[in-house]
């Protein structure tokens, strides 16, 4: 059985993440999604709580034809220990999938097989761009799965982001 690990902040979960997971579902028997920086919320870079991100992901993946786990992963303040921390919080996995250079390096140094999936229209499908559009009042809904739009509206996420921006 091949179990893959895919980590991201998912602030918010978007169509680029969805495309990667659809691809991983073809090659993995199970997928572990690590919700990174789980302790962070209510900031411009991390407006959503770990629980809200878990909700976005689980609602968006209802049609994924692969069993998956969604596990919040808090940061540790020593990068050299991070891969071991992740392994202690997740089921065992064979491969880490990431395009983040630090994540790739840390898991490589920990002796884990690391593969970098292709990025899906990275210029548009990034949390930074989606949050920028939310703040600017520009359309963002087409960049995330419909289930994520619903969650963001349920939690009044755009207004939260705008209030945080005013406070800074």
Swiss-Prot record:
Coiled coil: none annotated. This is Nicotinamide-nucleotide adenylyltransferase. Keywords: ATP-binding, Cytoplasm, NAD, Nucleotide-binding, Nucleotidyltransferase, Pyridine nucleotide biosynthesis, Transferase. Pathway: Cofactor biosynthesis; NAD(+) biosynthesis; NAD(+) from nicotinamide D-ribonucleotide: step 1/1. Its main location: cytoplasm. PANTHER family: BIFUNCTIONAL NMN ADENYLYLTRANSFERASE_NUDIX HYDROLASE (PTHR21342:SF0), PHOSPHOPANTETHEINE ADENYLYLTRANSFERASE (PTHR21342). It comes from the Archaea. It is found in: Cytoplasm. Its EC number is 2.7.7.1. Gene3D superfamilies: HUPs. Pfam families: CTP_transf_like (PF01467). Belongs to the archaeal NMN adenylyltransferase family. InterPro entries: Cyt_trans-like, NMN_Atrans_arc, Rossmann-like_a/b/a_fold. One of its GO terms (biological process) is NAD biosynthetic process. It comes from Methanoregula boonei (strain DSM 21154 / JCM 14090 / 6A8). The keyword ATP-binding applies. It catalyses: beta-nicotinamide D-ribonucleotide + ATP + H(+) = diphosphate + NAD(+). GO terms for molecular function: ATP binding; nicotinamide-nucleotide adenylyltransferase activity. Disulfide bonds: none annotated. The keyword Transferase applies. GO terms for cellular component: cytoplasm.
């Amino acid at each position: 059985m091949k179990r893959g690990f895919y980590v991201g902040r998912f602030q918010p979960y978007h169509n680029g993440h969805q495309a990667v997971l659809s691809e991983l579902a073809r090659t993995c028997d199970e997928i572990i999604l690590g919700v990174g920086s789980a302790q962070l919320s209510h900031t411009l870079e991390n407006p959503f709580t770990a629980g809200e991100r878990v909700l976005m992901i689980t609602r968006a993946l209802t049609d994924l034809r692969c069993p998956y786990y969604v596990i919040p992963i808090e940061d540790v303040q020593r990068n050299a220990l991070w891969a071991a921390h992740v392994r202690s919080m997740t089921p065992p996995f064979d491969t880490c999938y990431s395009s983040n250079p630090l994540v790739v390096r840390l898991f490589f140094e920990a002796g884990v097989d690391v593969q970098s999936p292709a990025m899906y229209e990275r210029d548009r499908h990034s949390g930074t761009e989606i949050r920028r559009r939310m703040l600017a009042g520009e359309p963002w809904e087409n960049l995330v799965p419909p289930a994520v739009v619903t969650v963001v509206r349920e939690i009044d996420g755009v207004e939260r982001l705008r209030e945080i921006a005013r406070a800074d």
